[in-house]
């Protein structure tokens, strides 16, 4: 995992904002993918790792769910019909009740341009698909551990 401002890295996971700012007061994670089976598989993985996780396949329900449930992290697919992950990230960043959440892009779109768009939209991290459980868990566990340790 890399933390820097670059979108040029060949790493499979990039983190652009220090994870400590997400402040995981709990281990709630919202997973969003229009492919329901993918969202549910990721949900099961995260639950097995001790996270409280909800999965959505409807991008139009994300902002309301995030405001109501207050997850510390939202994992978003980028390409979804009707409302893509980039626009969702912008909307979550624009709302005072969701602007602090850790936003993780999980997507097959991993070119330099794709990463730059994700960063500009407000994502904190980018995990390239095909996603292995370890990739996402590295980001989420780091965020949760940093909260337990307190701000650096």
What feature does the model see in each segment?
Residues 104-106:
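Hydrophobic/aromatic residues positioned on beta-strands within the core alpha/beta folds
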Residues 40-48:
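Charged docking surfaces used in two-component/phosphorelay signaling
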Residues 1-30, 43, 134-152:
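Non-catalytic signal-transmission and effector/linker regions of two-component phosphorelay proteins
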Residues 50-58, 62-65:
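Short hydrophobic/Thr-rich beta-strand motif most characteristic of the beta2 strand and flanking loop
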Residues 69-75:
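Active-site beta3 strand of CheY-like receiver
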Residues 129:
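A Lys-centered signature of the CheY-like receiver
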Residues 80:
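Receiver (REC) domain active-site loop signature in two-component systems and cognate sites
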């Amino acid at each position: 995992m890399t933390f820097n401002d670059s979108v040029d890295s060949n790493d499979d996971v990039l983190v652009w904002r220090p994870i400590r700012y997400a402040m995981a007061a709990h281990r709630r994670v919202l997973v969003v993918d229009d492919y329901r089976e993918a969202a549910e598989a990721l949900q099961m993985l995260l639950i097995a790792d001790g996270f409280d996780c909800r999965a959505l396949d409807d991008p139009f329900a994300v902002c309301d769910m995030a405001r109501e449930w207050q997850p510390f992290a939202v994992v978003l697919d980028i390409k979804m019909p009707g409302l893509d992950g980039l626009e969702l990230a912008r909307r979550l960043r624009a709302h005072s009740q969701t602007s602090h959440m850790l936003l993780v892009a999980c997507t097959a779109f991993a070119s330099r341009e794709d990463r730059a768009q994700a960063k500009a939209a407000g994502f904190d991290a980018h995990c390239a698909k095909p996603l292995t459980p370890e990739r996402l868990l590295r980001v989420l566990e780091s965020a949760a551990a940093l909260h337990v340790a307190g701000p650096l």
